[in-house]
């Protein structure tokens, strides 16, 4: 029997999500791993499918910046859609067997997997033939509203991208766009339909089981990811703020970053951050938990090595004395725009943004 390995990742920056899809699809293509289902949430983001029209983004650049929403072009089907907190995004990365190699059937099966979950909460939903996605209300009805977007990509019967189910989503953000280019109908969420917020973990559990049922597969839960911390060391406030960047030694990549490190056995993220701060800079200063946890793939390994990282900030006096540890060969205090330009990973940039907000 086929198996589907389910990864429940929490928050994933969008560009990290694209990297995960690429790595898992390559791993599947090369026979290094089996089918996987990635379940996650993205920060506010607008994505453009292959059929997207730019005019379906109705918000100005200033409005997008205010909401912290970036725009990405993708190779999935469909028009423009929104991703954000409270929305469960699923990326099935399946190599379809010969008896399932039909694009329309695959889309119907994704829809059915979502519809079965909605039914568990008493929500009746279904497809509308002329529009993609999962809908509440009939075609042509004045109250027809989309509850889940579907946008997939298939290459040699290997699937990527997937679905976005509005669970506890802020529906006001859909006013930034014409969702999927459809002006005649609205959007909704499970929270709006039921009048209460739902535990995301319960919906994830139901989705994982539903996909395994629809795709005749046995469920396997992914092993826990490696756990790491990032620490933005900052001195000064506002426009005068300066961020400590350290350069990894050439044999460790040679790039600039904020402080990072792995959790050791028995450590909490805060304990690991305090230890890394002292080991890598000689500083012993109180930490601020940024309430920022996200997942990503470490490097380009196949199958991917998953990491879950917690972000912290440290505010130090102007005369703070930095003494580099063995992992780095240089450090600089730079302004925030320079730090954001130099940092190679979105998660590190987000740590700096939060630390200097």
Curated annotation (Swiss-Prot):
Nudix box, short sequence motif: residues: 261-282
SUPFAM superfamilies from the UniProt entry: Class II aaRS and biotin synthetases (SSF55681), Nudix (SSF55811)
Pathway(s): Protein modification; protein lipoylation via endogenous pathway; protein N(6)-(lipoyl)lysine from octanoyl-[acyl-carrier-protein]: step 1/2
Annotated catalytic residues: 180
EC number: 2.3.1.181
Recorded catalytic activity of this chain's protein: octanoyl-[ACP] + L-lysyl-[protein] = N(6)-octanoyl-L-lysyl-[protein] + holo-[ACP] + H(+)
Site (described: Lowers pKa of active site Cys): 146
Pfam families referenced in this protein's UniProt entry, alphabetically: LplA-B_cat, NUDIX
All residue ranges annotated as the BPL/LPL catalytic domain in the record: 31-219
Enzyme superclass (EC): transferase
The organism's place on the tree of life at top rank: Bacteria
Residues bound to substrate: 76-83, 149-151, 162-164
The Nudix hydrolase domain, residue ranges: 224-356
Region (LipB domain): 1-222
Annotated GO biological process: protein modification process
InterPro entries (UniProt xref): aa-tRNA-synth_II/BPL/LPL, BPL_LPL_catalytic, Nudix_hydrolase, NUDIX_hydrolase-like_dom_sf, NUDIX_hydrolase_CS, NUDIX_hydrolase_dom, Octanoyltransferase, Octanoyltransferase_CS
Record keywords, A-Z: Acyltransferase, Cytoplasm, Hydrolase, Multifunctional enzyme, Transferase
UniProt GO cellular component terms: cytoplasm
Family under the similarity heading: In the N-terminal section; belongs to the LipB family.
Xref: PANTHER family: LIPOYLTRANSFERASE 2, MITOCHONDRIAL-RELATED, OCTANOYLTRANSFERASE
Protein task: Catalyzes the transfer of endogenously produced octanoic acid from octanoyl-acyl-carrier-protein onto the lipoyl domains of lipoate-dependent enzymes. Lipoyl-ACP can also act as a substrate although octanoyl-ACP is likely to be the physiological substrate.
Additional detail: In the reaction, the free carboxyl group of octanoic acid is attached via an amide linkage to the epsilon-amino group of a specific lysine residue of lipoyl domains of lipoate-dependent enzymes.
Name of the molecule in the record: Octanoyltransferase
Protein's organism: Myxococcus xanthus
